[in-house]
């Protein structure tokens, strides 16, 4: 670690060697109390207007009142005057080494270096341009806060602090060990979160060495190192209100600078089926919606496989009138039912991906038009049958009821359809048992992934909110349940 030198020229030479070729590097030589100095910062990250206003105000306010014998003559004396005897809003911790200096500058701060002083004075004059606080597009709700996380870490931390206004909320910041040196924060309530879990998360993130850190999801492979895991015991939210609710349950929230997505851990399987609106409606209607979500999730996984299994291997279980229509439709198509279903599933994923990656103003229209044209043309040309298109459409609609489970649901749907098409009822049963085994084998920091779905009072069926409030709940109470 390179310590700052008492020579201003050496410090500037070290900075110029690193950032001299960068157009945004700003270094301005000044003189304070007849002492040579320099202001260093990155342009457009720190506000030059605010900085010069602070320095000029300090110089004009304090210089006339100083007696000649108290006038500073060395860099150390000037530093002491500005730090301890002026009204400058400087940061408490001085800069003593080059790595810390660069970290402060890349955070949008300005640093004053003085000749003859081995410390730098830091000013928080950030002038970063960023996206304002907006409503997140991926988490719709009817009631409650409309605010969403922004891209700046400090803004997101302030949103959480505004919601949890107690001394129990702890927000630890650190810098990732990667080339980008991205700042992240670990947030938890010290009276509810498990100290062991917090220590484990802190240690894991310190030891993690990603190539770059652009989102909180980059930490998941280090927190839960499983190579072939479909379900991860984590969740994501872009709503400060949702993150605050999870913190009050004893969970840990990880925020990364530059990303509005907060990583919540540990997370349970049943939490993919609830939302903030569940607690703003009656318990009966909330329970109905949750049952509907569970049904939609399993429908999105098993419906194509069950349809292929019944139509190909067990046609006697289908009502005769429906069976005759399916047989007539399949007779007019050149592909077998199994291949037809796989083709439609893959086509729908291609259309969805195309709509997602296109500009927002065109994405929805392109997806809708492409689905209608391809479906109508395929049926008209006799390439695909109407029952297959109908089953695939129901499946595609069902998967969006639980967007947080979209990725595993898509892969499992393909796997179940393959198993049902190749091995019939045996393959379908084996696939269902495989899904169940995958879910039961997951443990979220000692808490079973499937816990709380039935007997917790806030699982598939929810009790009324008053009854839930009478017994404070944290996720660590489910350990080993």
Task: Give, region by region, the residue ranges found by the protein language model.
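Hydrophobic alpha-helical transmembrane segments of membrane transport and translocation systems
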Residues: 386-388, 393-481
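Flexible domain-boundary/linker segments
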Residues: 32, 57, 118, 177, ...
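Membrane-embedded alpha-helical signal segments
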Residues: 1-302, 316, 320, 440-481
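Amphipathic alpha-helical protein-protein interaction surfaces
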Residues: 165, 331, 424-425
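Transmembrane alpha-helical segments that form the functional core of multipass membrane systems
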Residues: 254, 267-415
């Amino acid at each position: 670690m390179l310590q700052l030198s008492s020579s201003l020229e050496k410090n500037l030479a070290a900075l110029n060697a690193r950032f001299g070729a960068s157009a945004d590097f700003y270094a301005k030589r000044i003189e304070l109390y007849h002492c040579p100095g320099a202001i260093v910062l990155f342009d457009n990250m720190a506000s030059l207007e605010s900085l010069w206003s602070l320095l000029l105000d300090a110089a004009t306010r304090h210089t006339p009142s100083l007696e000649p014998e108290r006038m500073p003559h060395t860099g150390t004396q000037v530093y002491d005057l500005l730090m301890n005897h002026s009204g400058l809003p400087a940061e408490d911790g001085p800069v003593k080494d080059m790595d810390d200096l660069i970290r402060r500058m890349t955070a949008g701060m300005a640093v004053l270096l003085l000749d003859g002083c081995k410390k730098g004075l830091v000013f928080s004059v950030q002038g970063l341009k960023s996206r304002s606080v907006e409503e997140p597009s991926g988490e719709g709700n009817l009631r409650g806060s409309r605010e969403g996380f922004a891209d700046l870490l400090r803004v997101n931390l302030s949103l959480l602090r505004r919601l949890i206004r107690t001394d129990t909320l702890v927000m630890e910041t650190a810098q990732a060990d990667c080339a980008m040196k991205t700042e992240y924060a670990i947030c938890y309530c010290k009276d509810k979160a498990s100290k062991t879990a917090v220590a484990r998360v802190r240690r894991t993130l310190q030891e993690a060495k990603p190539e770059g850190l652009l989102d909180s999801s980059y930490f998941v492979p280090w927190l839960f190192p499983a190579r072939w895991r479909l379900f991860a015991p984590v969740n994501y939210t872009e709503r400060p209100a949702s993150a605050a609710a999870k913190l009050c349950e004893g969970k840990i929230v990880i925020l990364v600078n530059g990303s509005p997505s907060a990583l919540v851990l540990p997370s349970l399987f049943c939490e993919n089926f609830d939302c903030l609106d569940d607690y703003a409606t009656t318990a009966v209607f909330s329970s109905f919606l949750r049952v509907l979500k569970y049904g939609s999730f399993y429908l999105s996984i098993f419906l194509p496989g069950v349809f292929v299994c019944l139509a190909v291997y067990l046609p006697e279980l289908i009502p005769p009138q429906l069976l005759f229509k399916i047989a007539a439709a399949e007779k007019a198509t050149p592909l077998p039912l199994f291949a037809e279903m796989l083709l439609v599933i893959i086509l729908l994923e291609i259309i969805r991906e195309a709509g997602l990656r296109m500009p927002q103003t065109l994405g929805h229209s392109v997806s809708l038009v492409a689905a209608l044209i391809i479906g109508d043309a395929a049926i008209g040309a006799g390439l695909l049958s109407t029952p297959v298109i109908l089953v695939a459409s129901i499946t595609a609609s069902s998967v969006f009821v639980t967007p947080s489970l979209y990725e595993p649901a898509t892969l499992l749907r393909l796997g179940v359809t393959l198993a049902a098409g190749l091995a019939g009822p045996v393959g379908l049963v084996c696939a269902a048992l495989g899904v169940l085994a995958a879910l039961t084998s997951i443990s979220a920091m000692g808490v079973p992934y499937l816990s709380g779905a039935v007997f917790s009072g806030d699982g598939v069926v929810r009790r009324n909110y008053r009854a839930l409030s009478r017994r404070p709940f944290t996720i660590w109470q489910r350990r080993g349940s």
